[in-house]
């Protein structure tokens, strides 16, 4: 299911469904495929990589968060589970006793009781069980049509005259954890029901991208955290020569679509944004450098150098009209997705052209019709 070798899918013109934050409600993917006619799915985490045994590994705080935002749990049951009188032990007991999934539907897909209608390419999010991901990476767990995109596993999708190259980086971005793998046993990091990105993963992704580079491909960086908020991800997108970034993690009611040229006054402001990210990383790096360099293997040292190369990847101060950094500044497009329960993005690909369509349930403003104070002449502006 998941290997270092590139995965390839070839399909005629069609739609790519992009969603985020299923939070274990995996059946929603099939419903969305029926609604949109999508040929495949890109997912940005949180996917819901939890099994029944995960309950023993999740911290009380994370468990409460999962219950609060799960779309698997009926509202009345959620209200009962989150009552102040419910202790952490009682909450765990009720989840364990439930005959229907509360944490995730993943076990139903592992046993074959449920299946995915189309190929799904996903990264993991910030709330996942690292032990479950380790089982997928080792091959102990497999689900037909589920492909995990990470620092060493990439995919190519030949669709509608375009070759999409998918790169992925899952987990939260936490500066103080970039050199901590937590309970992970390989290169991925996590613990207590959460996962985060490490510096070595960033370095490995750069290595993977270099090995498979093909100028005829259209490159997409899929991440859980947003490159718009995390400068190191914006630097990574530049390093990978990404044409698109697709991310999640902000939980807005509407999707976001932008390029840096559209939101920055000039390229120098963009450079300053990345320079701040560089400084934050280097300040942290100076504190751990001696310890890390004394304990990494030769192979890890190469990956570490790759990561430092990303951190030091800043656009030039003065650029020529055809400079590659200026091209990225104007042409690299960024999408941040709402939760799957709130909206989606469709890439409609045909004859080499990638069209986009966004859908959102949006905000409900009907309450304003009943706002007596505004109707009676209150100021329209603050």
Predicted regions and their residues:
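Active-site-proximal loop/helix segment associated with metal-binding centers of metalloenzymes
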Residues: 65-91, 158-220, 363, 370-377
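Short coil/turn segments at secondary-structure boundaries
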Residues: 29-33, 54-57, 134-138, 179-182, ...
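Conserved beta-sheet core of the metallophosphoesterase superfamily
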Residues: 119-121, 220, 225-351, 355
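Beta-strand-turn-beta hairpins that frame and shape the catalytic cleft
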Residues: 7-16, 153-168, 173, 177, ...
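Low-complexity, serine/threonine/proline-enriched polar segments
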Residues: 66-99, 103-107, 166, 274-319
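Core catalytic region of metal-dependent phosphoesterases/phosphodiesterases
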Residues: 25-156
């Amino acid at each position: 299911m998941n290997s270092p070798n590139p995965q390839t899918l070839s399909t005629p013109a069609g739609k790519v469904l992009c969603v985020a934050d299923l939070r274990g409600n995996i059946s929603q993917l099939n419903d969305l495929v029926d609604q949109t006619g999508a040929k495949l799915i890109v997912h940005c985490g949180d996917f819901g990589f939890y099994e029944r045994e995960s309950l023993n590994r999740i911290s009380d705080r994370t468990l409460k968060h999962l219950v609060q935002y799960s779309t698997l749990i009926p509202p009345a049951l959620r209200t009962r589970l989150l009552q102040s009188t419910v202790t952490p032990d009682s909450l765990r007991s009720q989840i364990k006793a439930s005959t229907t999934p509360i944490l995730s539907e993943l076990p139903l897909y592992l046993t074959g009781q449920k299946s995915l209608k189309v190929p799904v390419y996903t990264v993991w999010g910030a709330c996942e069980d690292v032990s479950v991901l380790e089982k997928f990476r080792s091959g102990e767990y497999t689900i037909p049509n589920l492909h995990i995109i990470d620092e060493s596993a990439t995919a190519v999708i030949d669709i509608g005259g375009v070759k999409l190259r998918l790169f992925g980086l899952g987990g939260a971005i936490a500066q103080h954890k970039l050199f901590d793998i937590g309970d992970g046993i390989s290169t991925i990091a996590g613990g207590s029901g959460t996962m985060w990105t490490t510096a070595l993963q960033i370095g490995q992704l750069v290595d993977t991208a270099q090995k498979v580079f093909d100028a005829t491909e259209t490159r997409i960086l899929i991440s859980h955290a947003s490159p718009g908020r995390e400068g190191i991800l914006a630097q990574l997108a530049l390093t990978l020569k990404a044409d698109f970034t697709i991310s999640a993690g902000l939980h807005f009611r509407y999707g976001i679509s932008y390029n840096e040229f559209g939101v920055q006054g000039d390229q120098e402001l963009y450079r300053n944004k990345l320079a701040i990210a560089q400084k934050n990383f280097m300040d942290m790096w100076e504190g751990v450098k001696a310890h890390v360099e004394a304990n990494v293997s030769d192979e890890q040292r190469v990956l570490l150098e790759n990561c430092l190369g990303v951190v030091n990847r800043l656009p030039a101060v003065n650029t020529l009209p055809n400079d590659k950094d200026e091209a990225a500044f104007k042409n690299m497009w960024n999408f941040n997705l709402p939760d799957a329960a709130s909206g989606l993005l469709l890439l409609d690909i045909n004859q080499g052209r990638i069209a986009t369509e966004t859908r959102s349930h949006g905000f409900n403003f009907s309450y304003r019709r009943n706002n007596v104070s505004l109707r009676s002449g209150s100021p329209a502006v603050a």
